[in-house]
Design a protein with these regions (language model features):
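Bacterial extracytoplasmic/cell-wall-associated proteins, especially those involved in peptidoglycan
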Residues: 1-173
């Protein structure tokens, strides 16, 4: 769980991991546990969705990003046809660089452009706000979003609307 930890030496990695797990267990309240149960997703799946939310936003639009993820997962014959197409997974695969078109061809189950559905597991530690967004996303009809020149996300119901927006943004041209 992302937090500030103090470790006195000599302790090993197992000690550090256990301390983080205990902290997560303290933050993972009965209410959150019930929401996970009610969601129909496993805790691993919720944490995977939460890490995607965490990595895709500065925090201002977590609920909308979570909504897009669920819309893509729950409507595999609409929008992106079940592919999440999350750039944060490409950044994980390429060592943290801005994703390129070539990165979309990296053969890995974490590549959400090549593989449908969720990646096998989280690749980052999501914060509590991202976990809450994964458990209670906004209700929208959005399947697409893009970061604009003003560094805020815009959301779209159709690929055509997103593509029109992208043509107006210098960062994509």
């Amino acid at each position: 769980y992302p937090d500030t930890y103090q470790f006195n030496t000599p302790h090993n990695a197992v000690y550090a991991i256990n301390k983080m797990l205990v902290n997560f267990d303290e933050k993972y309240t009965d209410d959150l546990r019930q929401k996970v149960t009610d969601s129909g997703y496993s805790i691993r799946e919720i944490l995977t969705i939460a890490f995607l939310v965490e990595r895709e936003t500065d925090g201002t639009d977590r609920g909308k990003i979570a909504s897009v993820i669920y819309n893509r997962l729950n409507n595999p014959s609409s929008g992106t046809m079940g592919y999440l197409q999350i750039d944060a997974t490409l950044a994980f695969l390429n060592g943290g660089k801005v994703p390129t078109e070539a990165d979309k061809a990296i053969d890995s189950p974490y590549n959400t452009y090549l593989y449908k559905g969720l990646p096998p597991a989280p690749i980052a530690n999501p914060g509590l706000d991202a976990i809450k967004a994964a458990l209670d996303p906004e209700k929208t009809g959005y399947f697409y979003y893009a970061l604009g020149d003003d560094n805020t996300h815009s959301f779209f119901k159709t690929l055509d609307a997103q593509q029109r927006f992208l043509r107006t943004q210098t960062r994509y041209n």
